[in-house]
Amino acid sequence: VLLPAVLLIRRPPVRWYWLAAYGTTISFGQFGFMFTALSVGMPTGLAALLVQAQVFFTVLIAALLLHEPVKPNHLLAIVVAAVGLLLIGVGQYSGAMPLAGLMLVLCAAFSWALGNIVVKRIGRVNPLSLVVWGNVFTLIPFTLVALWQFGAEGVWQQISLMSWRGWAGVLFLAYVATLVGYVGWGGLVSRQAVSKISPL
């Protein structure tokens, strides 16, 4: 995400602590917890499903901190979605969900929700510059987590043994899923009530 974008895109006119808050919640927190959950045996399909709990966390935090009203139709939609997530998760993955993995995915969802609130508090800025410069604060934490999990030799081995498919996946995550996806997402969240956007 950082290179070469950080060299080409101007830093958004917000304080550094807001950029740090954005990077450490919606980027490092969300994906750090998610990838750690996968490493302890959490099924990928179930992780992708349960991380949508960010909707519930976002609506709750927005009501508490931003004083956004929670309308009855929002509550009904949340209840229906929660029941649906529960039924799908229990039905398809019964017995295949490690407790540690579950807690880590929920932490990822909570981090995503916090990131949504940060975007809302920052207000209307160029979402592309926010994504790029916010990720300046993720480089060191991600590096430390990788070294903690795999060690320097393990990290180097994984990099050196990656196939072209692996590198294609990295590029897709960095420049399509993150830049394109989160630029669009951030633009919506900054302009609308987060309780309206988060279920999307």
Where are these regions (language model features)?
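Hydrophobic alpha-helical transmembrane segments of multi-pass integral membrane proteins
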Residues: 1-6, 21, 74-80, 100-104, ...
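Hydrophobic transmembrane alpha-helices of multi-pass small-molecule transport proteins
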Residues: 2, 61, 70-91, 109-110, ...
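Loop-to-transmembrane alpha-helix entry segments
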Residues: 13-18, 48-51, 67-87, 95-102
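Hydrophobic/small/kink-forming positions within alpha-helical transmembrane segments
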Residues: 23-32, 55-60, 86, 109-113, ...
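Specific alpha-helical transmembrane segments that line the substrate/conduction pathway
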Residues: 26, 35-69, 108, 194-200
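Helix-helix packing/entry segments at the starts of transmembrane helices
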Residues: 31, 47-53, 118-139, 174-200
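Hydrophobic alpha-helical transmembrane segments in multi-pass integral membrane proteins
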Residues: 32-39, 86-94, 98, 138-155
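Hydrophobic/aromatic residues within transmembrane alpha-helices
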Residues: 37, 64-66, 70, 122, ...
